[in-house]
Amino acid sequence: VEDGVAFPQEELLDASSGAAFFAEQTCTAVAVDRQTGHIYGLYILHPNNVGRCGHICNASYAVEREARGLHIGEKLVSDCLRQGRAHGFRILQFNAVVASNTHARHLYERLGFQPLGVIPGGFRMKDGHYEDIYPYYHVL
């Protein structure tokens, strides 16, 4: 969130607002080193909509910069697909994958996600310029 290059939120969470935010999710999972307790990444999973579209879920992922290249993201996304199915969702949809997030886009496509097109200038970067976003989906 602080980098302003991938998440739509602009405000950082403190301990109280963070606890409330994560408690609201259908699933919150972490990639943690069991020996040291160090958290390398996490994801949240929740409904993308309500009612007749409530079978579609959405997720967001974060991987610690120093842990990139260790396949943490792949493990998080794969687990998220399993959790989505286990919670009764039928589709996992990403609403806004930023164009410059090429590592994530390649990972999603390698794991079977389908791009739905492009939304020109759909994401305002921290420095104020706009980048395209790509919605993706995966049938669970």
Residue ranges and their predicted role:
Residues 93-97, 109-131:
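Conserved catalytic-core motifs of GNAT/GCN5-like acyltransferases
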Residues 84-97, 106:
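Conserved GNAT acetyl-CoA-binding A-motif
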Residues 61-66, 70, 98-100:
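Active-site acidic-Proline motif in GNAT/NAT acetyltransferases
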Residues 58, 103, 110:
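Amphipathic alpha-helical recognition patches that constitute DNA-binding helices
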Residues 7-66, 77-78, 83, 139-140:
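Acetyl-CoA-dependent GNAT
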Residues 1-7:
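Short amphipathic alpha-helix that is part of the acyltransferase structural core
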Residues 5, 37-38, 114, 129:
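Residue-level signal for well-ordered, solvent-exposed loop/turn and beta-edge residues enriched
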